[in-house]
Amino acid sequence: MARGGWSGGLLTGVVVVMHAVVWFWRSRVVTEPYMDEAFHIPQTQEYCQGRFDQWDDKITTFPGLYLVMAVPSLVVRWASTVFPSSSPVHASLGFLLCSVKGLRLCNGLVFGGLSALLSFEILGEVHPGISSEDAFLNALAINLFPVYFFSADLYYTDAGSLALVLLALLLALRRRHRASGVAAVGAVLFRQTNVVWAAFVLAYDLHSQVNPKGRSGGLLGLPRDLGRVLRGAWVHRARLARNNWITVALMAAFAAFVAKNGGVVVGDRDAHKPKLHLAQFLYCCTAVAGAHFLVHFDPRSPFVRALSGASKARVLLIAAPLLAAFCLVIRRYTLVHPYTLADNRHYTFYVWKNYLGRSEVHRVALAPLHLFSAGSLVHRLARTQPPLVVLAAFACAAATTALAELLEFRYYITFYAIHSLLSEPMSRTKAAGTCAAFLAANVALEAVFLFRPFTWPDGSVARFMW
């Protein structure tokens, strides 16, 4: 099993060094809080000063990131009261820890490195026969995913959010059920929508406890798989309740919060109202499949071979109504958020302006690509996971994307990671090729971000980003 040892440590070191290089250049060029950092960094700095009664109403998330990142500074402040003779040193250290540079560094290195190690360990648990080399390359590819890698070195919630979801999953895989629940609580404190992925981890954990060897010959085994799990859950209900009560309590507490709060977000509710944007789920499927284009768009892939081996009549019988449904979704459930149209710093602005927003014909023309991508993703995951897990993964992906009006690629990060970890690992050649492609993309994106700024009419400097 690819577990622990030098490979996991080497992977973590490599990823940490990459984030450190990005941090070095951003610290030299982008010295002030950028984009949403303008909300996250001042809020954390308030907590660093012990002012927990201060809150910016424009912030939409729970304060998990700010609380965690304020802890080192608060410890230093406490140390200065215990050792007053060294208080000037403590004051300087506390300032550095909560500076723009310090917060970005801790966020990228700690959570970026943790996600890398957790990815490696999860691959070893889910795929016991995987070699250390293959686990290294597959985990590296996941952590180089350009949308994630770019965001991890900003003071955003993405890096910590993913790390805690992966920690909850790994602990569940290792039968540390209550610890997994605690990690899930942390994940939700970083980002509310992680309650959906906490539910996925719970479903995965329950399935493995009552039907540990449950595999299927495809989605046709869903009724049988569901029957086994329901029977097993009833028989072992007392044990399951003892093991998973923390995650269940989290779900109940979050439901109570939503009912009392009148929504999921904490602040800026008018701009973040849930709306049915089903087309975004299709974008998510295409983006995730496109990220592993060497796998999903390989003419020799298992999915393509399955299509080629099936009768044309059967393929047409299944594909035609699905394609019609996809076209209907695109026509009726495509939304565009005012932020997408107003902010030309984001690549999504240009995706909409130059293609998606040009006409309905342009959007509908992508329906076959969306269908192929979704089919390939389902087929690949179903090769290694039981039907209920496949269904749960895609249901959670839909829940975290299809209710968001804003076209935002960062919403796809967790599904990309979960799908990549639970699916059949890429071959060594394809994993290496994916790493190379991601690395090249990251270098290009970073160069544009740092060295190709432009000026807004008000004279402020703007930079291209996801």
Residue ranges and their predicted role:
Residues 74, 101-128:
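Transmembrane-helix motifs of polytopic, lipid-linked glycan transferases
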